[in-house]
Design a protein with these regions (language model features):
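A contiguous loop/helix-start segment that scaffolds small-molecule binding in enzyme catalytic cores
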Residues: 201-210
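Glycine/small-residue-rich loop that forms an oxyanion/phosphate-binding "nest" at active or ligand-binding sites
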Residues: 67-90
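RNA substrate-binding interface of SAM-dependent RNA methyltransferases
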Residues: 43, 101-193
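Boundary-proximal intrinsically disordered activation/regulatory segments immediately upstream
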Residues: 1-55
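Short loop/helix-cap segments at secondary-structure boundaries that form the rim of catalytic
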Residues: 58-65
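Alpha-helix capping/helix-boundary segments
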Residues: 36-38, 57-58, 74-75, 145-146, ...
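Conserved small/polar residues in nucleotide/adenosyl-binding loops
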Residues: 213-215
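Short acidic-hydrophobic, aromatic-tinged amphipathic segments that line or gate anion-handling sites
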Residues: 3-5, 68-71, 165-171
Length: 215
């Protein structure tokens, strides 16, 4: 098995760049770290380009892509966790066009979560994971929201990001228009209301807006 021993290695340089949103957007790729997340990426049919493992890590089996060993100190520089599990993958983004996304969220007849300029990676990952568990059919993000393909969000989402289509728009107005085109009833969270969430019927075909802006 090939072992990467230099930070000038082409694969290693790509992985280093993918820690930045600029290059994730440019290359249409992102990193997924950890045993469970990488395995879920494979099981859900994600397009994995390469799997990297720390030199002291057992060699994983069953991946249809190259598996490359990385000198431990170099791997630790890529890892985004204090106690790395010693495995990460480079994955090609799934970026549906508008019509494909609409078909995906219509087909499931489920709810859609809309993230409006949220920033905290842990919170966003938890929201995506919870929405997936609740049967939501997709995620829409508005410009200004943290990158869903950042390492912390990918890890916090715990595989849910692989199961839910994602689509990004430039404005809240465009997002609402998209939800309405999909036949969703739009509901926004906020403080300026007397309506409590448990009094609202949200079992299906809802576009739920979670916003950083107090509505």
């Amino acid at each position: 098995m090939k072992t990467i021993t230099s930070k000038e290695n082409q694969i290693y340089r790509l992985c280093s760049k993918l820690t930045s949103r600029k290059y994730r957007d440019l290359y249409g790729k992102y990193l997924a770290e950890g045993e469970k997340v990488v395995r879920e990426a494979q099981e859900t049919g994600q397009n994995i380009q390469v799997v990297l493992v720390a030199q002291n890590h057992p060699i994983p089996q069953g991946y249809p892509c190259p598996v490359v060993s990385v000198e431990t100190k170099l791997f630790e520089k890529l890892a985004q966790t204090m106690t790395s599990q010693g495995i990460l993958a480079v994955i090609n983004k799934v970026q549906p066009d508008e019509q494909t996304f609409l078909q995906q969220i219509k087909k499931k007849s489920g709810n859609v979560i809309l993230l409006d300029r949220l920033q905290d990676p842990g919170n966003i990952g938890t929201i995506i994971r919870t929405a997936d568990a609740a049967g939501y059919s997709g995620v829409i993000t508005i410009k200004g929201t943290a990158d869903l393909y950042g390492p912390k969000i990918v890890r916090a989402a715990a595989g849910s990001l692989f199961r839910m289509p994602v689509f990004s728009v430039d404005s809240p107005e465009r997002a609402v228009s998209l939800l309405e085109a999909a036949g969703k009833t739009v509901i926004a969270t906020g403080f300026q209301t007397d309506l409590y969430y448990y009094n609202v019927k949200m079992d299906r075909d809802i576009g739920l807006i979670l916003s950083l802006i107090h509505i």
